[in-house]
Amino acid sequence: MPSAGLCSCWGGRVLPLLLAYVCYLLLGATIFQLLERQAEAQSRDQFQLEKLRFLENYTCLDQWAMEQFVQVIMEAWVKGVNPKGNSTNPSNWDFGSSFFFAGTVVTTIGYGNLAPSTEAGQVFCVFYALLGIPLNVIFLNHLGTGLRAHLAAIERWEDRPRRSQVLQVLGLALFLTLGTLVILIFPPMVFSHVEGWSFSEGFYFAFITLSTIGFGDYVVGTDPSKHYISVYRSLAAIWILLGLAWLALILPLGPLLLHRCCQLWLLSLRQGCGAKAAPGRRPRRGSTAARGVQVTPQDFPISKKGLGS
């Protein structure tokens, strides 16, 4: 009966997955609370202490005026104005910054440090995202498919000798390593140099960006004390698009590479067992020891499907 099948589905698959999902969220909440709550309390106490010291040094101000000034600073920050800057700082809405913002909209990163403040800008952002997000998905699909075409040679496994399979695994690992260096290692080094961050902060920004989490605590090109080249944020937006396509390519290839390494390991074990069972004899052409592990294209649907399917 349908109700029995529904209960079986919930009991067999959905319920364990739901429990694992909730437990993972609870674990993350607990660890984040332990790591960050004390630092937040220290920062809050330090801020209150600095306000009291400021009022002691400037007795012409009272607590109410101070709170009003802090409120003005917060409103300016929400609207994308850095309180450390002045009127001579570059605009947050010049073409390069606007291009960077458009990229964060269609990629759904949404740092949160900058957003439209006018009603017309907010309405346009809604319709721009409605069209831009599907367009971004289609673009990344086709870009990832083009990148995947370069892996066609190392994704054909049928009737290949063992030495060729080893070379294919090494080639795939080299491809992933070089791509990771170009996308996830070198850009954080550049960001660290330009922004004055540590490498760990640059890598954190790169991962948070390319995973489309986009907290907004680290954003390139926003420090008013630095002089950036005019195309700096535009180049960062292009890096984001290429990085998203790269991650969409390698995320399915990670399990694939692990699976192929396991296949090679099983192949070595079977050939070793075959050699011990019949020393001095070559295995028959159709035997299991001669064939090793049979791998068909159906085992790797990634080579025949488009990105994101």
From Swiss-Prot:
Catalysed conversion reaction: K(+)(in) = K(+)(out); Rb(+)(in) = Rb(+)(out); Cs(+)(in) = Cs(+)(out)
Induction note: Down-regulated when pancreatic islets are exposed to a cytokine mixture of TNF, IL1B and IFNG.
Description of activity control: The channel conductance is stimulated by extracellular alkaline pH. Inhibited by Ba(2+) ions, quinine, quinidine, chloroform and halothane.
Residues that bind K(+) 4: T108, T212
SUPFAM superfamilies, alphabetized: Voltage-gated potassium channels
Tissue: Highly expressed in pancreas, in both endocrine (alpha, beta, gamma, delta, and epsilon) and exocrine (acinar and ductal) cells. Expressed in pacreatic beta-cells (at protein level). Expressed in pacreatic delta-cells (at protein level). Not detectable in the other tissues tested.
Positions bound to K(+) 3: G110, Y111, G214, F215
Residues annotated as binding K(+) 2: I109, G110, I213, G214
Keyword Transmembrane: yes
InterPro entries: 2pore_dom_K_chnl, 2pore_dom_K_chnl_TASK, K_chnl_dom
GO CC, alphabetical: endoplasmic reticulum membrane; mitochondrial inner membrane; monoatomic ion channel complex; plasma membrane
pH dependence: The homodimer is gated open at pH > 6. The heterodimer with KCNK16 or KCNK17 is gated open at physiological pH range 7-8 and increases current conductance at alkaline pH without apparent saturation.
Segments dipping into the membrane without crossing: 98-116, 202-221
MF terms (GO), sorted A to Z: identical protein binding; metal ion binding; outward rectifier potassium channel activity; potassium channel activity; potassium ion leak channel activity; protein heterodimerization activity
Stretches the record annotates as Selectivity filter 1: 108-113
Function: K(+) channel that conducts voltage-dependent outward rectifying currents upon membrane depolarization. Voltage sensing is coupled to K(+) electrochemical gradient in an 'ion flux gating' mode where outward but not inward ion flow opens the gate. Homo- and heterodimerizes to form functional channels with distinct regulatory and gating properties. In pancreatic islets, conducts K(+) countercurrents for Ca(2+) release from the endoplasmic reticulum (ER) and regulates the frequency and duration of cytosolic Ca(2+) oscillations coupled to secretion of pancreatic hormones.
Domain notes: The pore-forming domains 1 and 2 assemble to form a single pore in which M2 and M4 transmembrane helices line the central cavity and M1 and M3 face the lipid bilayer. The transmembrane helices are bridged by the selectivity filters 1 and 2 carrying a signature sequence TxTTxGYGD that coordinate the permeant ions. Up to four ions can simultaneously occupy the selectivity filter and at least two elementary charges must translocate across the filter to convert it into the open conformation.
Subunit-level organization: Homodimer; disulfide-linked. Heterodimer with KCNK17 and KCNK5.
Membership in a protein family: Belongs to the two pore domain potassium channel (TC 1.A.1.8) family.
Annotated protein name in UniProt: Potassium channel subfamily K member 16
